[in-house]
Amino acid sequence: MSLPYPFSALVGQDEMKRAILIAAVEPAIGGLLVLGDRGTGKSTAVRGLAALLPKMRAVQGCRYHCDPQASGGCDDCLHLKSGVRVRTEELPVPVVDLPLGASEDRVLGALDLERALVDGVKVFEPGLLAKAHRGFLYIDEVNLLEDHLVDLLIDVAASGENLIEREGLSLRHPARFVLIGSGNPEEGELRPQLQDRFGLSVEVRTPSAIADRVEVVRRRDAYERDPSEIGRA
């Protein structure tokens, strides 16, 4: 797996970088919306964030990486409320991409059809919302997201839980994450209901200084040749 472009190697865009760090330090701020021209490093900055985050402590083997010190976890971790000691592990804070073409099953999770057909058991296969729990859910071109997915995100972001009632399944699991969206306003408007879910917003522009543009190309070329080297530069 290739290394993401380093967050610190981005040229300029100080307001965007500061906003991303604020959202990372204080998740209660309510998410971040980054709007601006294409090619301004919006996606690169968000994906580079993962390397800056400290690891988190989670219940070992939990599919939703529940916090062993917090209540309100998944059904499998309800015993934590009784004070029972459990094994834990350190995991990277998840930074999960939600692509525009993602199906509802992929986002919410769905019945594992292979297990159902082969073993005759109903097993829930967690979706992107589960993977993003306690981390970040990133949507590039969020202004182009399909309406039905927007409605789902609004519900989950408000409740902090994902409720599944389909295909004979009825369950809920925690889904608390920092929502980060980016997009170009010229390509489509963002629904007001979703825009209200972002507590912080920032606009970015293509660098106008020739020196900055040259430096962007130089650093990108260095990254393409040796991703690990630019991270140490």
Residue ranges and their predicted role:
Residues 1-203, 208:
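Conserved ASCE/P-loop NTPase catalytic core
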Residues 114, 215-230:
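Conserved AAA+ ATPase "sensor/coupling" helix adjacent to the nucleotide-binding pocket
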Residues 174, 212-215:
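Short, charged, surface-exposed secondary-structure boundary motifs
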Residues 233:
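Conserved small/polar residues in nucleotide/adenosyl-binding loops
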